[in-house]
Structure formats: structure tokens, C-alpha cells
Amino acid sequence: MFEHHKKESPILSLAGIGGGPAAYLFYEAAGGGGGAALSRSLRFAADAGTNDYLSKSFSSAGNQTTWSFACWFKITKPGTDFQVTPLFSGSSPWGGISIYQDKLRFAAYSGSSYVVNLHTTQLFRDPNAWYHLVAVFDSTNGTSGDRARLYLNGKRITAFSTETYPGPSATTTINSTTEQRIGHEVSNNVYSNCYFADVYFLDGVAVTDTNGTVNSFGEFDSYGVWNPKAYTGSFGSNGYH
């Protein structure tokens, strides 16, 4: 599992809304179904001087051409950058997903060029909202525009201000033996101000969508609200939840 690195206080600071063990961040989907109640999250509080992050070093590299990542996140300080996915190592090559200048950025850099570089036009500034993110990297896909995909609250993101897609069989340092970090962008020494919950990484698995909706980690209830759902597929060698 990931190791917890802290400067002063633990990041396990939220025991559900209101702080009670019976309070939940999310509830099962209305009307039944596979909805999963989530009762815990991790708080990363760079402003408090804690400089917390999670780290993991794989003993062997997994599939670097195909993987999926999913999580719920909540911004606690709009206007600040923070890392979402594992990695963002300190030197080239580097890669990961972050909130950068209030936009969601999916980027990986190697040598002197970007392997992938997607910046959403949508801005992320709401400190009260929980967002569900799914990121898919699949450079084996025959369609260039499908080799890197982002989904927000179940729906595929299609509006980008910057848009560079991976070449065939391109790789990033995500899922390599390089130390993987969540909550710390080493290249700029940026720590996070946010909450994370229900984090998944799938090694060698590119989850798919139906008409732009990905249902592997969530589902819409009868009111059209996106709710968490337990993933039931393969995790691969280096996958985790």
C-alpha cells in the first residue's frame, strides 16, 4: 500500500461529515443499485504546513501503455495548484494529473516534448463540490483521441484549451518503478490543499464508456446525481484501491 509521509499532523483527519462515524460523504444511489457508501476521506492541508503526501515504489514496473485512475476529490483552497494522480517526479520524464491554474491538467513530459498534454476549459473553483475523476491512458488504442481520456462525474470531457495526445504505444513514468506520489508535485515542490476519497488505480486496464458515460466506478441515481459504485473488475499486478 501507499506510505504516508507527514511533517506534523496525520492526514486522516475526516471521519465523515460532522466528524461522526455514522456520517457519510456519499450515499448509495437512490432506488437501489450498486451504489457504495463512502465514509472516509484523506485531507491534504499544505496551508497548515503539514506537507503530507502518499508514496509507493513498485518492485517491478506495470503496464505503462495502459492504465486507469479514479478518485473523488474536493478543493479546499481554490486558486492553488495541486496534484491528483500518482507521480509527478522531480525531473524529466514526469507525468500525472493535477489542478493547474484552476484547470484539470493531464500531462506527461519526456525528453523535450509532451507525451500527453490536456488542459480542460472548465475551471475548478468550487470549495463545496465533490468531483469524481476518471483518467484513462491507453496508447495502444488505434484512435489517437482515445489514447488519453478524462471523465468528470461520469461524463467524458471533450472541451480542452490545450490538446496533445500520445503516439502509438507511448509510455509515461506512471506505473514505473519510479516512486509514485499522491499529494505532492515534486517538480515544483507543490503540496496539496484538498480531500481525496475512493482512489483506484488499474494496471493494464483501460475502462471504457458507453455513449460518453463511464460506469465502472459510479452510476446516476433516479435524480440524475452521480454516486460512487464499487469497482468489480481486474486490478492488474500493481493496481490498488
Name each model-derived stretch.
Residues 18-65, 102-103, 110-115, 176-179:
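Low-complexity, glycine/proline/serine-rich flexible segments
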Residues 71, 128-139, 150:
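Short tryptophan-centered beta-strand motifs in secreted/extracellular beta-sheet-rich domains
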